[in-house]
């Protein structure tokens, strides 16, 4: 300590036969020394200590993906991994996986958007792997006037707001998260998250058109999916839900576990 005092030119401690106390210069010195040490610890953590494996999923707004993610996280040591799940816009799902921000992306193809999405997959060197194919369902809250119907037609829906997820600058129907997005609806309301969407269903008797694969454990039991009834002017369409990953890559153990959990849940819903 005396050598350090000589080197920096200040007295850090007052020394007496009763012990030592900090001088004013000493307190100032320790203040800066503590900051330097904390910076050193940050650098050590970033560059010297073993790094955690980061596992990320980007997805359109599907509650079953969150369910599979939860079950996956429960199976691994949280001290060895950092996790991220991003419910986001369609184009961001693609970009996140292409830029390796996420390991897997979950979205759907249909007859309407297949050509556009396949082109984007090719441009970004991504592969699409189908998981499940399903027809359109009307998703609404249990207090909705149409909730007790065995099926619902487009004519019946016209009296209520159609809810969809905001896609930002990519507002084309090719990037919509809802099936039958190419149709014209008298009333349209856009939202950015599932919680707001559910609130609008209750507050405005809104509806959305989806796969019908709903996780009640996460969304609650106040909502239900009713089959969409097509007619000659308003045909039904198939949703092909799947995942994307970079070409010529393999998922590690945690990625495979996530896929297994997702497939298991989708299998139960069938």
Residues covered by each model-derived region:
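A short LG(V/I)-centered, amphipathic sequence patch enriched
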Residues: 3-22
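Secondary-structure junction motif
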Residues: 65-69, 110, 114, 150, ...
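Hydrophobic hinge/microswitch elements
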Residues: 98-101, 167-224
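N-terminal winged-helix
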Residues: 52-95, 253
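Flexible hinge/capping segments at coil-to-helix
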Residues: 120-162
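Beta-alpha-beta core module
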Residues: 123-129, 134, 195-247
